Every structure is written in structure tokens, then in C-alpha cells.
Amino acid sequence: MMTYQEIFNEIKNKAYFKNHRHVLIAVSGGVDSMNLLHFLYLFQDKLKIRIGIAHVNHKQRSESDSEEAYLKCWAKKHDIPIYVSNFEGIFSEKAARDWRYAFFKSIMLKNNYSALVTAHHSDDQAETILMRLIRGSRLRHLSGIKSVQPFANGQLIRPFLTFSKKDLPEIFHFEDSSNRELSFLRNRVRNNYLPLLKQENPRFIQGLNQLALENSLLFQAFKELTNHITTTDLTEFNEQSKSIQYFLLQDYLEGFPDLDLKKSQFTQLLQIIQTAKQGYYYLKKDYYIFIDKFSFKITKIVPKTELVKDEKMLEYDSNLCYRDYCFSFMPKSNEDQGQVSIPLFSLSSIKLRSRQSGDYISFGHFSKKIRRLFIDEKFTIAERQNAIIGEQDEQIIFVLIGNKTYLRKACKHDIMLAKLYIDKLEKG
């Protein structure tokens, strides 16, 4: 067991709070978080911080309300702000965790806290690694918990992560009876599996934490050795060995945490990219991958409501700037080779929008889907996403993409009534 002074002596050199003045402490009332609260309260002047308390009452035990009342009383006595939230909905480990961190984030944003501090220690780290091994997690997810990571408008800090539970002083706290319920995997790991494994190897927890550290260093080294590779460039990607491609794609997918592909889905995606089959491929959760001749990109499908928000209406004889272009009905006085003019056979308002599923344009004797037009003309992903569709009287009259404009073919008896002029806005 260590004293708070000994803990402080180790923590101060890590400068966790160097860039923070107001920090929010997640306090459940258990022994770990109560130790964290007392430690930061005692050393807040030396750390040059001011603290606040965030507590979530999960309403799952009869003692929950008395624990909340105690924390409120403690905070009032020590003149510390406290924020409390009551969990609502169907309880599960994940639902409770999501609720807690959404609450912590909202408090940080509303009250200008730049850091959230939690009491995770090395035993929690080992539990997390063992749980992920049991669940069959990927190698990169065996890196465990980080001592500092981005969160909300600042950082999530875990200053106790290098200490074990037995290092923390004895202190008044509440015992959570649900920690003994074996219906939760973490409780089975903590109360059943780890004690048995420690009988085989008393340093098993240290071994798991060393595994997490080395795994983290391994993936950091991989990033440093491959940071010159543009993963989404098909030429560069396919020049790599199959093993490097595997981990490059894994690394790229880390940018889409809610996509969460199964191993079979990941393997299928890798095969599609390796064979460079051009086109759109649906993945899951509204995500798809688009592959063209030169590159690939994963994008979340934009809901129709979002597409509607992006629409603009251009009335006759008015001006409108939309994205990188200015639309008007008056030509420039000087001849400008860059100005595009579009003949209009109606004076109705013109809707400017993004491409939507099923869009097509008439070229006279035949019509063509916009999607097929983009594929045939080999436009890049970025060009397709930035394309502007002009719609008048429920017909697409032009498609503006890249440096090209495609016009609807006029009917034989159409009479031109006006012209629409399009100028690219200068960026400076």
C-alpha cells in the first residue's frame, strides 16, 4: 500500500495536468474513485488544478440514492461543484457506460472542464485485456487502456493506470453489491478467472499489462514505418505485401469506429480492394466503399434528410453562390473563357443539389443514370461527391462535375428563354 504523497511523487513527473486548470472527476463512490477524489482534492494546489465531481446514479440498487446523497454532502462540505445524472432506459453494461460518458462529455462542454479523470488502475487494464482475449478481439485491440487520450473538448486522463489496486490506500467507500454478480463478464473475470490464473502465475496481471504495452509499441512502430504510404491510393496499396495490406486496411478502418466489421467482412473487403473491382459496395451501418481506377474510399451514406438540407433554390433573375460556384442570369461584361453558360427553356426556379439515387439526365434519344455517367467518365470519388445537379421543372437540366458540364438535350420545339451563367469562385 502506498501513501498519497508517494503516489503524487510518481504522478507529478508525468505532467498529466500540465495543460489543464479545471478537471472533472468521475466518482462512483467505490474504493478506486474515492481514492482518486481524495488524492486530487489534497494535491489540487500542487497540481495547479480545480476539481469538479461527476456522478451517475444507475438506479439499480437500493443503496444508490444514499451514495448519491453522501457525495452531494461531501462536495458541499468541501466546496466542490458536483453534477449528478440518473440513468434511464434498459440497463446493460454498454448502455450504462454510454450514458456515463455522454453525461461526462456534456458536463465538460457546458462547464469548461478540459479533462475528465477516471480511477482505472493496472488491475482494470489486465481485466480489459483478458476480456478482449476471451471475446476474440483483434491483435490491435489488445493494447488496452491508454493513460491519456482525446475526449470531448479535451482529454481523458487515467493517472492511476500504472498502480495496482493494492497500491491504493484504505479509505471510506461504498461497496457495490452488483460487483459480485456473475452475470457480467467483467465480474467473472475479476472474481473467478484472474484469481485462478494468478495461482498458476502470481505475476499474470503484470504479464497481461506488459503484453498490452508491447502491442501498443508494435502498432506505433508499424505506423511510423508506413506513414509514407497513402493507404487509399490503389497503386501504392497494391505494391505492398499482403501482410502489410492487411494491417494498413485495419489502420484505415480505425477512422470509422462505429463501422465495426466482423472478421469475415474485413476479409471480403480486403479481397475487393486487392482485385480493384470498381464500383460501390455496401458494407454495413450505412457505410459503403467506392473504388475507382485510382483509389478507394469508405464513406457513410448521407441520409435523405441531410441531402435536402444541402439543397438551394435559385429564382429567375437572381444570384446565388453555392459551394464553389456563383450562379447568375447576367454574363460578365468581359469575355471570360472560364464562365459556363447554360440555355434555359423555362423561367421556373432551379434547384441546386447533390446527386441522389436514381438520378438520370436526358441526352435526347437516350437517357443516362448519373451514377453510370460518373463511372463511364472515370470521375474520382472527390469529384463525384462535389458534383452539383441542376434541376428545373422536376427534370435534371445540367450536371456540373470537375471541370465539365453535362447538359440535358433540348426537345425539338423548345424555345430558349434565358441563360444561366456559372462562375467558379476564386479561393484565396
Curated annotation (Swiss-Prot):
* Name of protein: tRNA(Ile)-lysidine synthase
This protein's record includes keyword Ligase: yes
| Family note | Belongs to the tRNA(Ile)-lysidine synthase family.
Q: Gene3D superfamilies of this UniProt entry?
A: HUPs
Q: Coding gene?
A: tilS
Where would you find this protein in the cell? Answer: Cytoplasm
Cite the Pfam families for this sequence: ATP_bind_3
Please write the reaction equations for the catalytic activity of this protein: cytidine(34) in tRNA(Ile2) + L-lysine + ATP = lysidine(34) in tRNA(Ile2) + AMP + diphosphate + H(+)
Q: What is the lineage of its organism?
A: Bacteria, Bacillati, Bacillota, Bacilli, Lactobacillales
Binding of ATP occurs at S28, G29, G30, V31, D32, S33
